[in-house]
C-alpha cells in the first residue's frame, strides 16, 4: 500500500505558526505512520503574487491526495483583492459538508452544564451562500431579491453523511430545517433526512425545526448530538455550539467531499479560528484546535495505524490540559511549544504502550 500524502496549505501570521505545531505532532517519527507531505504557500503575499493560482494548485493536490490540512489565512478587506481562499477551496474540491464538533475541554466550564459532544453537519454549498442577489425599485418601493437553491443531490449527501457519522460516534440525529414555513424549498432537505432515517433505523432520530433546535440545545446536555443544517443555518449554529463549550480551542473544522456512493473521498481540515495577528511571534497561542485538525485528518486515512495515531493525539491533547499543561487562554501558563511538546511526549508514550499490549 502506498504511503498517504497530505497536502499542507500554509497560511498567515499565527495561523501558520499553529500549523507548524500541528505538523510537529504529525511527524512520522511521533505517530509511527509513514506520510508524505506536499506544501503550498497560501499566504496573502503569495496569493497576490500568483493571482490565486496557488489556491487552484493546492485544491488540485487536495483532490488528488484526498487529504489536506490548512492554516488560517488573511482575507483582505478590499473587494478587488484576492479575497478569501476558503470559499474557492470548497468549490474546487467539491466540498459538500462541513463538520464541526463542540466538545468539553478539561478545566473549561461549559455553558448550562452541556456535557456530551455536539456535532454540526453543515451543508457546504448552495442555499443562501452563492445565491444571486439584486434590487429593484426606488425609495420605500425598493425590493431585494435572492435566488437561493437546494438540489436533492446535495441534500441527500448531507443527510447520508449525517446518519453515517451519527452511527459511527453513537450519537442521536437532532434538528432539521424550518420545513413548516418553507414547505417546498426547505422541505426537500427534510425529505432526505427522513429517508436517511429510514435507511438507518438503528440511529436515533429526533427531528426538530431549526428554531426549536436552538431553543432545545441547552436541554439536551446528556446525549451526544449530530445536527444537520442548511448552509447559513449551519454557519451560525456551529459558532454557537462551539462557544457553548466555553472555548473554540477544542474544535476542528472538517470539509468533506463524497463520491457517487456517498463515501468520503476528499478531506480538508483546519482550525475554526483566524490568524490572530496580535499573538504572532509571542509563543502564547493555543495550538489545540490545529493539533486536533491533524488528528481528525488521520481518521480518514483508513488504516489501523492511522486510527491509533489519531486516537493517541486526541487523548494526549486533552490529558495534557487535564493535568494542568495548558496555554493562557485556558487559564494555564504553558507556552505554545511547551504544550505541543507535552502532547508529543504523551502520543509517543501511548503508542509505545498500545504496541506492547498488542504484542
Residue spans for each PLM region:
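Short glycine-rich or small-residue beta-strand-to-loop segments that form or flank ligand, phosphate
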Residues: 5-14, 68-72, 172-179, 295-299, ...
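Glycine-rich phosphate/diphosphate-binding loop of Rossmann-like nucleotide-binding domains
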Residues: 7-24, 28-30, 138-209, 223
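Buried hydrophobic positions in well-ordered alpha/beta secondary-structure cores of metabolic enzymes
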Residues: 12-15, 66, 121, 162, ...
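N-terminal beta-loop-helix "entrance" segment that forms/cooperates
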Residues: 32-56, 217
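Short acidic loop-to-helix transition motifs that present clustered carboxylates
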Residues: 45, 208-215
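Glycine-rich phosphate/nucleotide-binding loop
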Residues: 46, 217-323
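N-terminal glycine-rich phosphate/adenylate-binding segment common to multiple enzyme folds
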Residues: 47-145, 232, 236
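Internal helix-turn-beta structural module
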Residues: 303-358
Amino acid at each position: 500500500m502506498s504511503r498517504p500524502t497530505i497536502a499542507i496549505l500554509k497560511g498567515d501570521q499565527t495561523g501558520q505558526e499553529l500549523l507548524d505545531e500541528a505538523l510537529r505532532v504529525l511527524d512520522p517519527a511521533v505517530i509511527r505512520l509513514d506520510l508524505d507531505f506536499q506544501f503550498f504557500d497560501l499566504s496573502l503575499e503569495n496569493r497576490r503574487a500568483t493571482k490565486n493560482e496557488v489556491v487552484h494548485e493546492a485544491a488540485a493536490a487536495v483532490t488528488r491526495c484526498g487529504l489536506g490540512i490548512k492554516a488560517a489565512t488573511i482575507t483582505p478587506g478590499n473587494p478587488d483583492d484576492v479575497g478569501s481562499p476558503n470559499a474557492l477551496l470548497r468549490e474546487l474540491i467539491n466540498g459538500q459538508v462541513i463538520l464541526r464538533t463542540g466538545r468539553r475541554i478539561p478545566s473549561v466550564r461549559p455553558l448550562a452544564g452541556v456535557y456530551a459532544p455536539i456535532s454540526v453537519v453543515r451543508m457546504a454549498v448552495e442555499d443562501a451562500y452563492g445565491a444571486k442577489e439584486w434590487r429593484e425599485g426606488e425609495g420605500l418601493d425598493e425590493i431585494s431579491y435572492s435566488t437561493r437553491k437546494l438540489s436533492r443531490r446535495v441534500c441527500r449527501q448531507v443527510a447520508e453523511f449525517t446518519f453515517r457519522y451519527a452511527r459511527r460516534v453513537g450519537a442521536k440525529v437532532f434538528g432539521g430545517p424550518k420545513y413548516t414555513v418553507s414547505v417546498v424549498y426547505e422541505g426537500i432537505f427534510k425529505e432526505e433526512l427522513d429517508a436517511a432515517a429510514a435507511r438507518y433505523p438503528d440511529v436515533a432520530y429526533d427531528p426538530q425545526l431549526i428554531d426549536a433546535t436552538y431553543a432545545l440545545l441547552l436541554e439536551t446536555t446528556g446525549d451526544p448530538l449530530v445536527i444537520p443544517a442548511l448552509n447559513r443555518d449551519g454557519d451560525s449554529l456551529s459558532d454557537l455550539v462551539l462557544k457553548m463549550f466555553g472555548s473554540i480551542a477544542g474544535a476542528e473544522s472538517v470539509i468533506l467531499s463524497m463520491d457517487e456512493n456517498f463515501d468520503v473521498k476528499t478531506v480538508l481540515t483546519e482550525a475554526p479560528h483566524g490568524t490572530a495577528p496580535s499573538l504572532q511571534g509571542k509563543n502564547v497561542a493555543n495550538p489545540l484546535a490545529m493539533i486536533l485538525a491533524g488528528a481528525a485528518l488521520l481518521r480518514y486515512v483508513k488504516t489501523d495505524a492511522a486510527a491509533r495515531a489519531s486516537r493517541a493525539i486526541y487523548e494526549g491533547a486533552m490529558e495534557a490540559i487535564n493535568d494542568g499543561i495548558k496555554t493562557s487562554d485556558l487559564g494555564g501558563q504553558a507556552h505554545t511549544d511547551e504544550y505541543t511538546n507535552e502532547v508529543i511526549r504523551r502520543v509517543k508514550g501511548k503508542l509505545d504502550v498500545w504496541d506492547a499490549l498488542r504484542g
